[in-house]
């Protein structure tokens, strides 16, 4: 009877796929290890990488008849469980698992799944049933189970069969080789190096306009639109390409030889005579740096002119060493004088015509604007969340010598994209929430590069204010500001990279049961990058959108496009509409202008409060989302509606002080300490030293802050927080209200302040 079982078992084994039969050789080798130490296994994957691979549910055996029981009898579940437990605890089993790519985490998951499969299945596959029966009868060896376990493990974790392929797909060590057409050329690389207001971009643009064909790649829609307008005004037909629209310089569907585009929309398949890449220092940006890297490596152009700060030169030269190209450097000096004043502003009473007060949060924008207008001075307001038309209107109002508006309050959104006639830049604060390369929010002093970029906006060439001035609002910030502006920007060390849609599609082919967010995590953790030149850009915003629409059935390519949408995830209404649009698209239902109108509250009304204004800004972003997707039929109608909405928002911003008053009036008796909290912030602004992290360490190292002073500041901070908490308890509705976002949409992160405060109390 035992010989019969052995013959049947052997027949079953020979009918297995070659990969499973080959595993028996490994099992045989393992039997020689009973009394010997295990052989060294291959290098294990990091635990955090293994945990990213989600187990696949294994389907039960589909055979209706229990052939195994008919041949060798039924299996006792209790005996079967003993065999499985013994199998999983064997040193030789674990050694074989390691040799086949299963680390401790994957072993645990696979053992558990295999055990449940064997115990809970009504009918086991006949060959596995016979193997278990032989072991129970003493005619088989427990290691005979391993080939079946390994087959099960590879079903649960499909990546075990394709790990080498996954690593090859995510090998990003030589991104220059991705662009074969660009590598086929011997490109002339010209770096126009200089500070703000030095004329570097002007000289690059002159070469662009004189070329037969050209492309301008800018960081903002405003800059691309400005180049588009100037080129056409000078008689050089030029098209405009941004994420939301395409405009033709000649006629519809008749492309011009020149293109002005945002850097993400740059074509790396079209040949040009001249390409201009503006603000090249953004190649280090944790979120968008990949777009500059792609443009610099991939543009098919005889001449590539890059403009930016001197700190980018060394990195560009190193990258060009990998492409066999050299960099010609043209240096420019600032065209106008810039003086750092010896005294701080001290009070808003000292604001003068031509002043621009730079804040790093919307809350500061609102409160400073109101305080200045309370002194009888009209204010222009610019921050990142405003539509482009509103920004331009506010800039024109401020620049017009005949206009009564002589003061501007803005965020660092003015650092790029707007021509402003500013006499003096005043830093209201030197502390800004930022995001590091790990995607963590932290509060730190503004960088040298950012400070120079903003300060350089003062004293523009050929304006009424050719001599620029810079100072701080608070006297305690002035010395720090002077020290920052006396430095040169640190050399850039790395350029950003990002997974492409093609790479993620290949990952999805190998891991069909993984979500898009999960695929991105696996890619980032498995990828290999040349750390001396490149880094992987932060993908948290992409993953946030991917997880939001994970339950919506969409093709992978469409899902990827949706997740690339430039959405501010701090705006609940925008996120809600994003989800609605994705659902509508997945059902193959038309996403029309009527759909947008019905969900966005058309027709629009003039805002009466700041909350109304913030909502209208969100609606504008939703319309941008509609046009960005390039998947929907009525983009033209939505664009016309955006123009109308832009004008309404402009009127709201022109009357921002009245909106603030209305907001406070509507909240009286409901959230009284909300206004109090805002006023307290203005009267007693946070000191830079109150933040934890690198800033505190830097001040301690420089001797500007002693441990004793730090201890006293912490006590004072804690006392203030206790006082605010006590005041907050007097309002029963405080927790039910949702006050306006306290940061600039594009440039700061309010959650960082709140998070830091909580840490401080601890």
Swiss-Prot record:
Signal peptide: none annotated. Belongs to the helicase family. The keyword 4Fe-4S does not apply. Keywords: ATP-binding, Helicase, Hydrolase, Mitochondrion, Nucleotide-binding, Transit peptide. Its EC number is 3.6.4.13. This is ATP-dependent RNA helicase SUV3 homolog, mitochondrial. It comes from Drosophila pseudoobscura pseudoobscura (Fruit fly). ATP binds at residues 194-201. GO terms for biological process: mitochondrial RNA 3'-end processing. Its main location: mitochondrion.
């Amino acid at each position: 009877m035992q010989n019969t079982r052995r013959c049947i078992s052997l027949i079953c084994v020979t009918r297995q796929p070659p990969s499973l039969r080959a595993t028996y050789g490994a099992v045989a080798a393992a039997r020689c290890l009973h009394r010997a130490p295990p052989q060294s296994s291959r290098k294990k994957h990091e635990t955090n990488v293994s945990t990213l691979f989600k187990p696949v549910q294994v389907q039960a055996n589909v055979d209706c008849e229990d052939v195994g029981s008919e041949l060798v009898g039924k299996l006792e579940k209790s005996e079967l469980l003993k065999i499985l437990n013994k199998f999983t605890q064997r040193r030789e089993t674990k050694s074989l698992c390691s040799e086949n790519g299963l680390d401790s985490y994957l072993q645990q998951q696979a053992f558990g799944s295999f055990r449940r499969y064997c115990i809970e299945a009504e009918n086991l596959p006949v060959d596995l049933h016979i193997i278990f029966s032989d072991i129970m009868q003493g005619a088989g060896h427990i290691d005979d189970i391993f080939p079946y376990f390994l087959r099960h493990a590879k079903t649960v974790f499909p990546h075990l069969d394709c790990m080498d392929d996954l690593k090859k797909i995510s090998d990003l060590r030589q991104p220059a080789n991705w662009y074969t057409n660009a590598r086929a050329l011997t490109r002339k690389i010209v770096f126009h190096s200089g500070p703000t207001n030095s004329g570097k971009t002007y000289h690059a643009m002159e070469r662009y306009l004189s070329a037969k064909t050209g492309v301008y790649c800018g960081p903002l829609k405003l800059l691309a639109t400005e180049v588009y307008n100037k080129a056409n005004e000078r008689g050089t037909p030029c098209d405009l390409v941004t994420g939301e629209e395409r405009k033709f310089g000649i006629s519809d569907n008749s492309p011009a030889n020149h293109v002005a585009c945002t850097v993400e929309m740059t074509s790396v398949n079209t040949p040009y005579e001249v390409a201009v890449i503006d603000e090249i220092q953004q190649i280090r940006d944790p979120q968008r740096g990949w777009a500059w890297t792609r443009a610099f490596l991939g543009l098919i152009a005889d001449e590539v002119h890059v403009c930016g700060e001197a700190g980018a030169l060394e990195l560009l030269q190193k990258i060009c060493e990998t492409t066999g190209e050299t960099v010609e450097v043209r240096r420019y000096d600032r065209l106008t004088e810039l003086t750092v004043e010896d005294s701080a502003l001290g009070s808003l009473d000292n604001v003068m015509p031509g002043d621009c007060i730079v804040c790093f949060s919307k809350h500061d924008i609102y409160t400073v604007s109101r305080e200045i207008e309370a002194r009888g001075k009209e204010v222009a307001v610019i921050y990142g969340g405003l539509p482009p038309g509103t920004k331009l209107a506010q800039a024109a109002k401020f620049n017009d010598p005949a206009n009564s508006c002589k003061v501007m309050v803005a965020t660092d959104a003015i650092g790029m994209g707007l021509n402003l006639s500013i006499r003096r830049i005043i830093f209201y604060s030197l502390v800004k929430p930022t995001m590091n390369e790990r995607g963590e929010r932290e509060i730190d002093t503004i960088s040298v590069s950012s400070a120079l970029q903003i300060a350089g906006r003062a004293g523009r060439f050929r304006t009424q204010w050719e001599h620029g001035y810079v100072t701080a609002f608070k006297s305690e910030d002035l010395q720090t500001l002077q020290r920052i502006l006396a430095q040169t920007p640190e050399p850039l060390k790395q350029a950003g990279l990002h997974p492409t849609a093609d790479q993620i599609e290949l990952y999805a082919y190998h891991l069909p049961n993984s979500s898009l967010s999960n695929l991105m995590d696996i890619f980032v953790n498995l990828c290999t990058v040349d750390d001396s030149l490149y880094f992987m850009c932060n993908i948290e915003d992409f993953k946030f959108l991917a997880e939001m629409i994970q339950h919506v059935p969409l093709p992978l390519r469409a899902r990827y496009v949706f997740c690339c949408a430039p959405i501010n995830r701090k705006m609940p209404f925008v996120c809600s509409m994003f989800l609605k649009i994705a659902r509508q698209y997945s059902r193959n239902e038309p996403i029309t202008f009527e759909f947008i109108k019905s969900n966005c509250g058309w027709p629009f009304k003039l805002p009466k409060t700041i909350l109304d204004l913030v909502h209208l800004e969100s609606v504008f972003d939703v319309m941008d989302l509609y046009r960005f997707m390039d998947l929907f039929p009525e983009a033209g109608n939505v664009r016309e509606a955006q123009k109308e909405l832009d004008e309404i928002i402009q009127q709201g911003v022109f009357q921002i002080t009245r909106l603030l008053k209305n907001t406070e009036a509507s909240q009286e008796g409901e959230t009284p300490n909300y206004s109090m909290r805002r006023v307290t912030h203005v009267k007693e602004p946070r000191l830079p030293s109150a933040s934890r992290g690198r800033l505190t360490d830097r001040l301690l190292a420089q001797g500007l802050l002693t441990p004793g002073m730090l201890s006293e500041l912490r006590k004072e901070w804690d006392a203030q927080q206790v006082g605010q908490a006590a005041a907050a308890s007097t309002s029963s509705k405080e927790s039910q209200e949702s006050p306006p976002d306290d940061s600039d949409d594009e440039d700061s992160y309010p959650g960082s302040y709140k998070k830091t405060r909580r840490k401080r109390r601890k």
